[in-house]
Amino acid sequence: MKANWKKLRKNIPNRVRTKSRTHYEVLWSDEFHFDEKTGKKTYGTTRFDPNLITLNINQGDKETMHTYWHEFIHALSEDYQLNLTETQVENLELSFLYVREFILTLEGKKK
């Protein structure tokens, strides 16, 4: 099943839950900069006090979804004390499209 990136991006919620009583507010911003520590441009952030995921509003649909998944994984790593490295987060991010397909198959929405 091919992803409809535009539809997926449109469905990003304003608030997402990682545990039964843990939520992250999801915000959009155009104020992202080059990260001198990593040497990469920043497209999203995850904060833990308060719980907040911020996404770059100026990305394309597919890039936005990957950033959203990436930041959500950072939140999961924190909330479940997984201590994932950035490389591990990046690798898990790449798997989310397949996890989505797996769930759709279980729900009978994909054959």
Residue ranges and their predicted role:
Residues 66-78:
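Active-site recognition of the HExxH zinc-binding catalytic motif
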Residues 5-62, 78-100, 111:
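Active-site scaffold of zinc-dependent metalloenzymes
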Residues 101-105:
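Short secondary-structure capping/junction motifs at helix and strand boundaries
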Residues 1-2, 107-111:
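Short intrinsically disordered terminal tails
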